[in-house]
Amino acid sequence: MDELFPLIFPAEPAQASGPYVEIIEQPKQRGMRFRYKCEGRSAGSIPGERSTDTTKTHPTIKINGYTGPGTVRISLVTKDPPHRPHPHELVGKDCRDGFYEAELCPDRCIHSFQNLGIQCVKKRDLEQAISQRIQTNNNPFQVPIEEQRGDYDLNAVRLCFQVTVRDPSGRPLRLPPVLSHPIFDNRAPNTAELKICRVNRNSGSCLGGDEIFLLCDKVQKEDIEVYFTGPGWEARGSFSQADVHRQVAIVFRTPPYADPSLQAPVRVSMQLRRPSDRELSEPMEFQYLPDTDDRHRIEEKRKRTYETFKSIMKKSPFSGPTDPRPPPRRIAVPSRSSASVPKPAPQPYPFTSSLSTINYDEFPTMVFPSGQISQASALAPAPPQVLPQAPAPAPAPAMVSALAQAPAPVPVLAPGPPQAVAPPAPKPTQAGEGTLSEALLQLQFDDEDLGALLGNSTDPAVFTDLASVDNSEFQQLLNQGIPVAPHTTEPMLMEYPEAITRLVTGAQRPPDPAPAPLGAPGLPNGLLSGDEDFSSIADMDFSALLSQISS
């Protein structure tokens, strides 16, 4: 029994009798990138495992049981045993041939190394780097040369500390080499540091199945998983390799919580985990919520307070106006007249019922020559009028002589469908008497224009005074057909040139002819003879008639 006791309860290892080396600050395993020599920049400094953004630390060793002079060599070896010399190199101050070597300070036993960087080599330079390690005797564990050939993990290295001190007799004494934790290249996804950068949501139902988008640093789609841990519970998110987008994004669904009937939110940890080396990222908080059987949040939408409902009703287009309608905006319009002077009201012009009341002394003597009057009357356009069929007086002798002197061919119109004759226009009332009179009285001429019209002639034989004009005849012309006496006939269109001719020549008006019978042929104006008969007024050629008048 006494012989088995040491086997069951082994004794504590005895402390070394001499000095030994201890690593009190390990190098940071992840987060550092190995630099190529062709990059032309410093490889950086290897940080310590407790290094932060505000407090920087570096790999540190302590020589226990010894204080005095000594040397230290730091080299790179492979991660897995046998720990062969690594083709990568250490660069920095006091570095040569791929390793670091310097004298130790005799006054202290703790030594820190701040200027150490890792420089990687290309695969094509791998054999040359291994041969250089053999030539410089950089082989801390004395691995045979035959075993140094083979594959190397270029994404992970270890630091090997070799310390040489002096024994009491002054001879050099090599202490056993010490290896650090592996240091991984942050550029390689299979060894890089795992880090969750961002998620689109950090809570979900306790039943699971919520889709989450996760952004991260480079990962390998075949060597990554989303790990959930809680008190006495762990689970993994559900996704496939196709859900890993370009090694930096993962779309997964949350696993169900251990207790699907929980009544209060539960906080758990969510991490990235690499199964190959069981490396974990920094945890991120995730919250499981109780299941309310309301996946579409209908109950939450129904929770409307009175004030909320009231505000909604105020904004509703179907609700009545709550505030009185604002008064319309008044726009200032500039007035054309002065505000101080009132605008005079329009006054009707007092027209007289007869020309006998006109003071002729107010008007200058004006008589038109016969040539200009006939030419002006021919050029003045007149609207076509429908002439009623009524007995007309015989043509004036002056007009008949004018027509005989300049005969014009009358075109014969082709027979056409008879057109309806418009009914006779109603006679104007007394109120319309002043229309033409006002137009005549308002005529204004300049001296030059009037002189050009009259031909600048003052011969009394040519011009006749207006005093010799018969007022009754002029009144009949202005009234446009209103008879002065009941026994006089209604004047027609052709009486105007006749009256003007009489004004120019000074001749008296001939007596009115006897009224023609109702069945008498010819037009009412008396221009056509008895043998010229038209079945309708539409058969008459007005253009030929006007050309005769103008000639």
Curated annotation (Swiss-Prot):
There is a cross-link at K37, K122, K123 (Glycyl lysine isopeptide (Lys-Gly) (interchain with G-Cter in SUMO3)). Residues 519-528 have a biased composition (Low complexity). Ubiquitinated by RNF182, leading to its proteasomal degradation. Degradation is required for termination of NF-kappa-B response. Polyubiquitinated via 'Lys-29'-linked ubiquitin; leading to lysosomal degradation. The modification Phosphoserine is found at S276, S281, S311, S468, S529, S536. Residues 520-551 are annotated as: Transcriptional activation domain 2. The modification N6-acetyllysine is found at K122, K123, K218, K221, K310. GO terms for molecular function: actinin binding; ankyrin repeat binding; chromatin binding; chromatin DNA binding; DNA binding; DNA-binding transcription activator activity, RNA polymerase II-specific; DNA-binding transcription factor activity; DNA-binding transcription factor activity, RNA polymerase II-specific. Residues 19-306 form the RHD domain. Residues 415-476 are annotated as: Transcriptional activation domain 1. A motif (Nuclear localization signal) lies at residues 301-304. The modification Phosphothreonine is found at T254, T435, T505. The modification (Microbial infection) Phosphoserine is found at S75. The transcriptional activation domain 3/TA3 does not participate in the direct transcriptional activity of RELA but is involved in the control by RELA of the accessibility of target gene promoters. Mediates interaction with ZBTB7A. The transcriptional activation domain 1/TA1 and the transcriptional activation domain 2/TA2 have direct transcriptional activation properties. The 9aaTAD motif found within the transcriptional activation domain 2 is a conserved motif present in a large number of transcription factors that is required for their transcriptional transactivation activity. This is Transcription factor p65.
